[in-house]
Structure formats: C-alpha cells, structure tokens
From Swiss-Prot:
Role of this protein: Aminoalkylphosphonate N-acetyltransferase which is able to acetylate a range of aminoalkylphosphonic acids, including aminomethylphosphonate, (S)-1-aminoethylphosphonate and 2-aminoethyl- and 3-aminopropylphosphonate, using acetyl-CoA as acetyl donor. Is required for the utilization of aminomethylphosphonate and (S)-1-aminoethylphosphonate as a phosphate source via the C-P lyase pathway. Is also essential for the detoxification of (S)-1-aminoethylphosphonate, a structural analog of D-alanine that has bacteriocidal properties due to inhibition of cell wall synthesis.
UniProt EC number: 2.3.1.280, 2.3.1.-
Species in which this protein is naturally found: Escherichia coli (strain K12)
Enzyme class, spelled out: transferase
Name assigned to this protein: Aminoalkylphosphonate N-acetyltransferase
Any one of the GO BP annotations: aminophosphonate metabolic process
Positions of the N-acetyltransferase domain: 4-144
Length: 144
C-alpha cells in the first residue's frame, strides 16, 4: 500500500480541490466562482484545508473551520468537507485526514469537532460512527 502524505492546500491546488468537491457533491460548479471562494477561504486564518496524496496524486481533502460558538462558550472545529476519491477509499485516507483535523482543532483550543453529512450518505455515516462520532443533532436547511 502506498504511503499517504498529508499537506496543507494552497492556491496552486485549486483544480485538484475543485475536482474533489465535484466528486463530493456529484455535481459541477462555476469554476471561476469556486476559485474566488477557495482563495478567499485560504486567506482566512480560521479556515484550514489539508490534502491527502498517494504516490504524489491528490486523492482526498478535508476542510476545517474554527469558530467560537456562543452556545458552547468555546471554540469548535467544524469539518466542512471531507472527501476521498473512489480509488483511494478503504486505504485509511479519510481516517488520516480526520485525525489531522481533530488534532488541529485541539491545538487551536477547540472543545470538539462537529460535522454534518447528507442523510443519503450511509457509508459516510458508518465511517463517522466508526471514527468515534455520535449523532447528536438534526440539521435543517432552507434554500433562499
């Protein structure tokens, strides 16, 4: 099994990150708007993106947003994105990315990490439960 290398994402990774997000959402997005948003997020000190590489190829990423929540009176690390390309699933890439984000949040003083995932993503639900997460809330959304 090839070694999994983790590293921070940079503006030079925009195309690779775009491909990962398209895989996650099973959709394509306006590439220019994505580039603008991704580069803005890279400048935000509370946003952290890390990539996973196998044999030099980007195969996964995680996005961590550090936020002070008033209802916790503490910092929380929100996992906003976690995606692994199909060819790299089952190789512990997701677990390594998640462990990185948890340690990053811990080092930043966060009391917990949290995330949401689509109700249809049963494999993701099993993954997060296996990684020690528990289902504790319902999330509601409304298109505007």
């Amino acid at each position: 099994m090839p070694a999994c290398e983790l590293r921070p994402a940079t503006q030079y990774d925009t195309d690779a990150v775009y491909a990962l997000i398209c895989e996650l959402k099973q959709a394509e997005f306006d590439h220019h708007a994505f580039r603008v948003g991704f580069n803005a997020n890279l400048r935000d000190p509370n946003m952290r993106y890390h990539l996973a590489l196998l044999d030099g190829e980007v195969v996964g990423m995680i996005g961590l947003h550090l936020q002070f929540h008033l209802h916790h009176v503490n910092w929380i690390g929100e996992i906003q994105e976690l995606v692994v390309m199909p060819q790299a699933r089952g190789l512990n890439v997701g677990s390594k990315l998640l462990a990185w984000a948890e340690e990053e949040a811990r080092q930043a003083g966060a009391e917990m990490t949290e995330l949401s995932t689509n109700v249809k993503r049963h494999d993701a639900h099993r993954f997060y439960l296996r990684e020690g997460y528990e289902q504790s809330h319902f999330r509601f959304t409304k298109a505007l």
